[in-house]
A protein has these predicted regions:
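Hydrophobic alpha-helical connector segments
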Residues: 57, 71-99, 152-155
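Short hydrophobic/aromatic patch on the recognition helix
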Residues: 37-48
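Amphipathic alpha-helical segments used for helix-helix packing
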Residues: 97-119
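Hydrophobic/aromatic-rich alpha-helical bundle segments in the mid-to-C-terminal region
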Residues: 118-127, 141-192
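Hydrophobic/aromatic residues within well-ordered alpha-helical segments
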Residues: 51, 62-66, 77, 81, ...
């Protein structure tokens, strides 16, 4: 039985996401995405008029999921900034332990498209990172951390750096080191 248009779009997005994440944007073709989604190429182009449009839609979908999850980090801040930092880096350690983890797809994509500054996916990646940093600043403000926007930028650098080092070395202990540095930076807690 054929799927409805409402059911087809999410299937295409998920298939494209998996392929882009696993192999990168340039190494995946529309034929392969159509096959993975179980649709014809005509159906794929009915929903997305180009590979660039599909990639932008994939990123928008992933942003919604990641941002919604990240917003839950601030539900209970009774432990203050230290608890927030623990949760942030424990989340990164858990995420990086998943099979086939390859870091932030947004970061990887920005690198892959580095020479295409006007590409809509680069704009989407920039918007995602900006909104995540702002949300972190909001959480730090709620935890009564002074200069929350400045601290959020510094923490975000630690998170991104930890992701890169985990990818390079395959060692999740970089999360522990980044968390210790974050605590020194934000709450003045000496490393354990």
């Amino acid at each position: 039985m054929p799927r409805s248009s409402d059911q087809t779009r999410p299937v295409i997005l998920q298939a494209a996401y998996k392929l882009f994440r696993r192999r990168g944007f340039f190494r995946v073709g529309m034929d392969e995405i159509a096959t993975a989604a179980g649709v014809t190429k005509k159906t794929l182009y009915y929903h997305f008029d180009s590979k660039d449009a599909l990639l932008t839609a994939v990123l928008a979908s992933q942003h919604e999921r990641a941002f919604a999850e990240f917003q839950t980090y601030g539900i209970d801040l009774s432990g203050g900034a230290e608890q927030l930092i623990d949760k942030l880096f424990a989340g990164l350690a858990t995420w990086s332990a998943k099979p086939r983890w390859a870091g932030s797809g947004f970061t990887r994509l920005a690198i892959e498209l580095a020479d295409l500054s006007g590409h809509p996916a680069r704009s989407m990646a920039r918007e995602h990172k900006t909104l995540m940093e702002r949300q972190l600043a909001t959480l730090l403000a709620e935890a009564q951390v002074p200069s929350p926007a400045e601290r959020a930028r510094e923490l975000f650098l630690l998170v991104e750096g930890a992701m890169v080092m985990i990818l390079v070395h395959g060692d999740r202990n970089y999360c522990t080191a980044a968390a210790a540095a974050a605590k020194k930076l934000v709450v003045g807690v000496p490393a354990a």
